[in-house]
């Protein structure tokens, strides 16, 4: 694969990413935070809303970047497997993206990574390789 050049995203890229992500998951809900409003001393007409990414298929916002990356690199990936290193949320996100795009995925994780992350990545079809960080 040729070396990828980086470029500053434009607003059109954001709109395209939103459309890609919407094909694979529902938007995360907004939750009003009364506690933060009170802590900040906000008036009656001022609100604080938090985006709850715990509702995504992997419980993290990282799935969105993984889905968009996979979509934008399908031609470069071709029939080859995708490999990634992560100890948690990105491992799950890229594994989910690979499942959605029917790509083989190999995840390298430290042995000390949370077991729930191993299980979730594997549930999406990831092949896991571990290493000892000591």
Model-found features: residue ranges?
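PLP-dependent amino-acid enzyme catalytic core
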Residues: 2-134
């Amino acid at each position: 694969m040729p070396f990828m050049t980086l470029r500053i995203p434009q607003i059109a890229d954001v709109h395209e990413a939103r459309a890609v992500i919407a094909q694979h998951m529902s938007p995360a809900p907004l939750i009003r935070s009364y506690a933060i409003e009170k802590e900040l001393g906000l008036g009656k007409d001022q609100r604080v809303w938090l985006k709850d990414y715990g509702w995504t298929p992997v419980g993290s916002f990282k799935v969105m970047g993984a889905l968009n990356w996979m979509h934008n690199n399908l031609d470069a990936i071709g029939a080859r497997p995708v490999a990634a290193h992560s100890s948690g949320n990105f491992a799950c996100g890229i594994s989910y993206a690979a499942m959605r795009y029917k790509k083989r995925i190999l995840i390298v994780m430290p042995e000390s990574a949370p077991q729930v992350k191993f299980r979730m990545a594997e549930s999406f079809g990831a092949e896991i390789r571990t290493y000892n960080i000591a």
